[in-house]
Regions:
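Non-catalytic signal-transmission and effector/linker regions of two-component phosphorelay proteins
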Residues: 1-12
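Two-component/phosphorelay signaling modules centered on CheY-like receiver
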Residues: 11, 20-38
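Helix N-cap/capping motif at the beta->alpha junctions
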Residues: 39-48, 69
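Active-site beta3 strand of CheY-like receiver
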Residues: 53-59
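Receiver (REC) domain active-site loop signature in two-component systems and cognate sites
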Residues: 64
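Bergerat-fold GHKL ATPase/HATPase_c domain
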Residues: 110, 121-176, 187, 191, ...
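Conserved beta-strand-loop-beta-strand hairpin that lines the nucleotide-binding pocket
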Residues: 136-143, 186-305
């Protein structure tokens, strides 16, 4: 989602990176959208800028001299809890997951020569407005298709419909990923709340209508996206981070739910988790048809409001 209209003017973005070229690219991009922008070369300079004018959001590199992005994140959270903060790195985000978990960080962008500014704008726009839900934010103007699932037994049919959208552009992981997300939503979102254990769960167990799972999908010329939503909001950001951490021995190999999320992130180009605790959980996957120009590393998007 990129904010449009005159609303951007009330938001300011502070960009923190020791690479002037990165600061300029992002400053030009956000200025072009109508945001007020500022720049700093490291965390210490960023804090000095914040004392002069508190920004709406800070986008900072992780590796910087004087003060790195993790320490800056910690200080901002402590002193300025109202400031949104997104980290960015040119390295593998997964290598930072233990550190990310320690600070409960949910949003990390991947920078590089092929900086995906559309994704940057969508991520920042959603964080600023708090309007994080909905596949349409990533596929504006595209027709959305929707299915309601009241039993896991319907998963295969829905997965097949979605895969058909990729006719002529087969993807070996899309079916698996959607099925994993539906299974997680059905059990952990609905049946678990109803007191049904995994041992009692059958594929044809029916969910009552108010707890049904919604699957939405859309595609454009470049990619296909799928959103799986449950109305319970049982997933916690801290658990999602733990399950995604490949170095945590207490995670995926012990829990089906965690293993599924780990596999989805590993094999899908973009994985976004949106959580409103106790109200709804939405997992969005986006798979590109042509990966030749994709950055080798993936961003991290876990939003909990």
């Amino acid at each position: 989602m990129v904010i449009t209209g005159h609303r951007q003017e009330r938001y300011s973005v502070l960009i923190v990176d020791d690479e002037p070229a990165v600061c300029k690219v992002l400053a030009d991009f956000f200025s072009g959208l109508g945001y007020r922008t500022g720049q700093a070369a490291h965390g210490g300079e960023a804090l000095a800028r914040i004392e002069e004018e508190v920004p709406s959001i800070v986008i900072s590199d992780i590796r910087m001299p004087v003060m790195d992005g993790i320490e800056l994140f910690r200080i901002i959270r402590e002193r300025y809890p109202g400031i949104r903060h997104v980290l960015m790195t040119g390295y593998n985000v997964d290598e930072y997951l233990s550190l990310i978990r320690r600070h409960n960080i949910g949003n990390i962008l991947v920078k590089g020569p092929d900086f995906n500014l559309r994704e940057v704008g969508q991520s920042v726009g959603s964080l600023l407005t708090g309007d994080i839900f909905g596949l349409e934010r990533y596929f504006p103007g595209q027709k959305l298709k929707r299915a309601v699932i009241e039993s896991y037994a319907r998963s295969e049919a829905v997965c097949s419909l979605i895969v058909q959208e990729c006719a002529g552009r087969p993807d070996p992981y899309l079916h698996m990923a959607v099925d994993e997300l539906i299974a997680n939503a059905v059990f952990h979102g609905a049946l678990h709340s109803a007191g049904i254990s995994r041992e009692e769960w059958q594929a044809d167990t029916v969910i009552d209508a108010e707890n049904a799972i919604t699957v939405t999908w859309a595609c454009d010329a470049e990619r296909i996206g799928v959103a799986v939503e449950d109305p319970k909001g049982n997933l916690k950001k801290v658990d999602a981070l733990r399950w995604l951490d490949k170095d945590d021995p207490s995670g995926r190999d012990l829990e089906e739910h965690g293993r599924g999320l780990y596999l989805v992130r590993r094999f899908i180009d973009r994985f976004i988790i949106n959580i409103a605790p106790g109200r709804r959980t939405e997992c969005i996957i986006i798979q590109y048809f042509n990966r030749d120009h994709l950055h080798q590393f993936k961003p991290l998007w876990i939003n909990e409001i």
